[in-house]
């Protein structure tokens, strides 16, 4: 019997030791510091890295106002109190930097008494009552004051003018509606770095497909006075007079090589009859009647064509496939037809437009490619750009 009892006692001791080891590993040896109830107990540096307003927040990826905003969705929904009600998110001048070496923030006065400010901030965060500081009064009044006033005064409302670095409105209890408190306070006076992307606005695919017609609708609400978003390599502003003056036609592949430039008379190209203007299949009329639906599909939205190679002055240098300008004008110079590329006849039929019209140099005013009166003023500019800027 004693031989059987000795292993049992050893087993009990071993079980007891194992239970103690298990309990010691489960219960933390160092008790955590008491924090705000309901919040996770993290270290001070970790919470400052997480919730600091000095840089980008880790929670800012859930923000509805973009990256790096100080108001993310948790604070906007009212799930958390305002930022500075947490003691670890308050400005920290007294730990790592001397107050004299700290950069002054705009709109704030320089520190009058740095040691007094530091001592009061330490006392306020610790919650220890402290005798008030009388900066405007002589020390005789402080000595004459009763002792009760020295214990009651700091708990009510410390003087706000002597402490520009602290926001004492936040030392009170957090309000019932933290979002209203945040909005009423305005932006935080932190030295927040400028964001990498000031604002990213997404425009729908349909507005981008319209070649520039849908841009005032899409961008105009965001940026007032926004003209057109047509691609301009030269940086020239969009000319509204050039909007609807050009009439681009589907030409035969020999249309750009014929005419007075090559020594042949233009009379052999018969002008387009006036009944062609009433044809609903005309590309110019289609772009006039339904500009929004066709400019994403047709190769020729009127005005500046979006996907063009632009010259240094910002104007068109070459047109798209199968489209040549109404180049047969008396103001045009010889050799302009070489600038524009010509393509095969199989690439000129778009959306079932089977008829092909030719450019006539002696165009009567009732033809399709009649130029508007204000377009005549723009023609020498296009001639000048195409003549001088022919580099690739």
Curated annotation (Swiss-Prot):
Keyword Phosphoprotein: yes
Family classification: Belongs to the ameloblastin family.
Function noted in UniProt: Involved in the mineralization and structural organization of enamel.
Keywords: Biomineralization, Extracellular matrix, Hydroxylation, Phosphoprotein, Secreted, Signal
GO MF, one annotated term: growth factor activity
Modified residues (Hydroxyproline): 37
GO biological process terms on file: biomineral tissue development; cell adhesion; odontogenesis of dentin-containing tooth
Any Pfam family hit: Amelin
Species of origin: Bos taurus (Bovine)
Biased composition (Polar residues): 359-381
Domain of life: Eukaryota
Record-given protein name: Ameloblastin
Gene: AMBN
Subcellular location: Secreted, Extracellular space, Extracellular matrix
Biased composition (Basic and acidic residues): 382-392
Annotated region described as Disordered, given as residue ranges: 86-109, 247-280, 349-392
Bias kind Low complexity: ranges: 97-109
Signal sequence, renumbered to the chain: 1-26
Lineage: Eukaryota, Metazoa, Chordata, Craniata, Vertebrata
Modified residues (Phosphoserine): 43
One Gene Ontology cellular component annotation held by this UniProt entry: extracellular region
């Amino acid at each position: 019997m004693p031989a059987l009892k000795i292993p049992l006692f050893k087993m009990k001791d071993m079980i007891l030791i194992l239970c103690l080891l298990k309990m010691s590993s489960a219960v933390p040896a160092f008790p955590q510091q008491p924090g705000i109830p309901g919040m996770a107990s993290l270290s001070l540096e970790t919470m400052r890295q997480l919730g600091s307003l000095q840089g980008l927040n880790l929670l800012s990826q859930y923000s509805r106002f973009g990256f790096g905003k100080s108001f993310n969705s948790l604070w906007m929904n009212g799930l958390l109190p305002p930022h500075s009600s947490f003691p670890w998110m308050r400005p920290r001048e007294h730990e790592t930097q001397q107050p004299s070496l700290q950069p002054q923030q705009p709109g704030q006065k320089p520190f009058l008494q740095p040691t007094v400010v530091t001592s009061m901030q330490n006392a306020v965060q610790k919650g220890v009552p402290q005798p008030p500081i009388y900066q405007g009064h002589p020390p005789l009044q402080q000595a004459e004051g009763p002792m009760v006033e020295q214990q009651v005064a700091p708990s009510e409302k410390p003087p706000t003018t002597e402490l520009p670095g602290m926001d004492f409105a936040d030392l009170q209890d957090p309000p019932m509606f933290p979002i209203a408190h945040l909005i009423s306070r305005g932006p935080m006076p932190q030295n927040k770095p400028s964001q990498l992307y000031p604002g990213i606005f997404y425009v729908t695919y349909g507005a981008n497909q319209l070649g520039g017609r849908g841009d005032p609708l899409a961008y105009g609400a965001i940026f007032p006075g926004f003209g057109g978003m047509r691609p301009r390599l030269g940086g020239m502003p969009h000319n509204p007079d050039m909007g609807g003056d050009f009439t681009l036609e589907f030409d035969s592949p020999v249309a750009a090589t014929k005419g007075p430039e090559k020594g042949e008379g233009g009379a052999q190209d018969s002008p387009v009859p006036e009944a062609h203007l009433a044809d609903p299949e005309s590309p110019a009329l289609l772009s006039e009647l339904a500009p929004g639906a066709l400019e994403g599909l047709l190769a020729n939205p009127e005005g500046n064509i979006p996907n063009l190679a632009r010259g240094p002055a910002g104007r068109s240098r070459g047109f798209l496939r199968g489209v040549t300008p109404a180049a047969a004008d008396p103001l045009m110079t010889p050799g302009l037809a070489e600038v524009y590329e010509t393509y095969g006849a199989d690439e000129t039929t778009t959306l079932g437009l089977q008829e092909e019209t030719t450019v006539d140099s002696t165009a009567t005013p009732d033809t399709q490619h009649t130029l508007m009166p204000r377009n005549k003023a723009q023609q020498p500019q296009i001639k000048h750009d195409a003549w001088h800027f022919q580099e690739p």
